[in-house]
């Protein structure tokens, strides 16, 4: 397949490496146009992939079979809209990011839209990307009209396993959102690795109760206990990890809070549900962000 990967951060480089190794034709797409992008990845087994790949070639984009978007949630909408007119109208766009809410911003996109969520963990260490842990990627249609692209899951399964297709991806996205609503803000506020959250079961349960109430009103069956158990599993499995939001806060970058607890707040408001704990966490992270964004440009840069 011919694939353009939009966003060449940790997750983007992980996919570029895996696609290259399987013989797919790939290019990266960078915010600041460059003729190539450097991919420098250390795999979980310690092997190194170090290549310069084509980047920002509009002719390549115009003949791509897939646009894989691995940007931060707040970067997605502007970036995808800027490329949509060059991309064939039949080429699916697969979004893989934390949080929810980008689909609502892309309702007018004509290409098939797919949503994904992944438990693969990768982080930047200087100029190198470390593939910290293998995981599973769930993908499915973002909107009712987006159809069956399960063949993509089969192809991507051979590239970076495991990949699973869901006709109802929204339920999976909500489960992942519950995890993100707990782990990301709490670790960002307390400046701690994921495992430290084990010591705060009441706080976790409080957040899960609020998230479960919203998920039920969204039409997906769940319970606070189920969500809590799932969150605790993820905390145990990723105990040593530094969450993406804490990494952003430490690097004085814009976080994805608007698409995590912020998205939950918007859906809660639509259903008339009070979510005081999620509101408190959202406001605390926004306050942290504003402290350094005021000192910098005052505004997050566009993608």
Swiss-Prot record:
<feature type="binding site">
    <location>
        <position position="98"/>
    </location>
    <ligand>
        <name>substrate</name>
    </ligand>
</feature>
<feature type="binding site">
    <location>
        <begin position="7"/>
        <end position="12"/>
    </location>
    <ligand>
        <name>NADP(+)</name>
    </ligand>
</feature>
<dbReference type="Pfam" id="PF02558">
    <property type="entry name" value="ApbA"/>
</dbReference>
<dbReference type="Pfam" id="PF08546">
    <property type="entry name" value="ApbA_C"/>
</dbReference>
<dbReference type="GO" id="GO:0008677">
    <property type="term" value="F:2-dehydropantoate 2-reductase activity"/>
</dbReference>
<dbReference type="InterPro" id="IPR013332">
    <property type="entry name" value="KPR_N"/>
</dbReference>
<feature type="binding site">
    <location>
        <position position="256"/>
    </location>
    <ligand>
        <name>NADP(+)</name>
    </ligand>
</feature>
<feature type="binding site">
    <location>
        <position position="184"/>
    </location>
    <ligand>
        <name>substrate</name>
    </ligand>
</feature>
<feature type="active site" description="Proton donor">
    <location>
        <position position="176"/>
    </location>
</feature>
<dbReference type="GO" id="GO:0005737">
    <property type="term" value="C:cytoplasm"/>
</dbReference>
<comment type="function">
    <text>Catalyzes the NADPH-dependent reduction of ketopantoate into pantoic acid.</text>
</comment>
<keyword id="KW-0521">NADP</keyword>
<dbReference type="InterPro" id="IPR050838">
    <property type="entry name" value="Ketopantoate_reductase"/>
</dbReference>
<feature type="binding site">
    <location>
        <position position="122"/>
    </location>
    <ligand>
        <name>NADP(+)</name>
    </ligand>
</feature>
<comment type="subunit">
    <text>Monomer.</text>
</comment>
<dbReference type="InterPro" id="IPR013328">
    <property type="entry name" value="6PGD_dom2"/>
</dbReference>
<feature type="binding site">
    <location>
        <position position="244"/>
    </location>
    <ligand>
        <name>substrate</name>
    </ligand>
</feature>
<comment type="pathway">
    <text>Cofactor biosynthesis; (R)-pantothenate biosynthesis; (R)-pantoate from 3-methyl-2-oxobutanoate: step 2/2.</text>
</comment>
<dbReference type="GO" id="GO:0050661">
    <property type="term" value="F:NADP binding"/>
</dbReference>
<feature type="binding site">
    <location>
        <position position="98"/>
    </location>
    <ligand>
        <name>NADP(+)</name>
    </ligand>
</feature>
<feature type="binding site">
    <location>
        <position position="180"/>
    </location>
    <ligand>
        <name>substrate</name>
    </ligand>
</feature>
<dbReference type="GO" id="GO:0015940">
    <property type="term" value="P:pantothenate biosynthetic process"/>
</dbReference>
<dbReference type="InterPro" id="IPR013752">
    <property type="entry name" value="KPA_reductase"/>
</dbReference>
<keyword id="KW-0560">Oxidoreductase</keyword>
<feature type="binding site">
    <location>
        <position position="194"/>
    </location>
    <ligand>
        <name>substrate</name>
    </ligand>
</feature>
<keyword id="KW-0566">Pantothenate biosynthesis</keyword>
<feature type="binding site">
    <location>
        <position position="31"/>
    </location>
    <ligand>
        <name>NADP(+)</name>
    </ligand>
</feature>
<dbReference type="InterPro" id="IPR008927">
    <property type="entry name" value="6-PGluconate_DH-like_C_sf"/>
</dbReference>
<keyword id="KW-0963">Cytoplasm</keyword>
<protein>
    <recommendedName>
        <fullName>2-dehydropantoate 2-reductase</fullName>
        <ecNumber>1.1.1.169</ecNumber>
    </recommendedName>
</protein>
<comment type="similarity">
    <text>Belongs to the ketopantoate reductase family.</text>
</comment>
<dbReference type="InterPro" id="IPR036291">
    <property type="entry name" value="NAD(P)-bd_dom_sf"/>
</dbReference>
<dbReference type="InterPro" id="IPR003710">
    <property type="entry name" value="ApbA"/>
</dbReference>
<feature type="binding site">
    <location>
        <position position="241"/>
    </location>
    <ligand>
        <name>substrate</name>
    </ligand>
</feature>
């Amino acid at each position: 397949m011919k694939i353009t990967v939009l966003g060449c951060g940790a997750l983007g480089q992980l996919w570029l490496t895996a696609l290259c190794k399987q013989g797919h034709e790939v290019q990266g797409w960078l915010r600041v146009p460059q003729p190539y992008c450097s991919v420098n990845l250390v795999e979980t087994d310690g092997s190194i992939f170090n290549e310069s790949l084509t980047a920002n070639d509009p002719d390549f984009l115009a003949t791509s079979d897939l646009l894989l978007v691995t940007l931060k949630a707040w970067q997605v909408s502007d970036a995808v809209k800027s490329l949509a007119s060059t991309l064939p109208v039949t080429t699916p766009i697969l979004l893989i990011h934390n949080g929810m809410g980008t689909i609502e911003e892309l309702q007018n996109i004509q290409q098939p839209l797919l949503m994904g969520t992944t438990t693969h963990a990768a982080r930047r260490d200087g100029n190198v990307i470390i593939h910290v842990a293998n995981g599973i990627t769930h993908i499915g249609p973002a909107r009712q009209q987006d159809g069956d692209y399960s063949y993509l899951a089969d192809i991507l399964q051979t590239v970076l396993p495991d990949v699973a297709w869901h006709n109802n991806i929204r339920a999976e996205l909500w489960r992942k959102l519950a995890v993100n609503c707990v782990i990301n803000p709490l670790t960002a506020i307390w400046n701690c690795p994921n495992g430290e959250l084990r010591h705060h079961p009441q706080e976790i349960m409080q957040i899960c109760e609020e998230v479960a109430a919203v998920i039920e009103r969204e039409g997906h069956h769940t319970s606070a206990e189920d969500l809590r158990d799932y969150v605790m599993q993820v905390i145990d499995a990723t105990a040593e990890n530094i969450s993406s939001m804490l990494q952003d806060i430490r690097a004085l970058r814009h976080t994805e809070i608007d698409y995590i607890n912020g998205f939950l707040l918007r859906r809660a408001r639509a259903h008339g549900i009070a979510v005081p704990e999620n509101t408190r966490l959202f406001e605390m992270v926004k306050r942290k962000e504003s402290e350094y964004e005021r000192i910098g440009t005052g505004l997050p840069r566009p993608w």
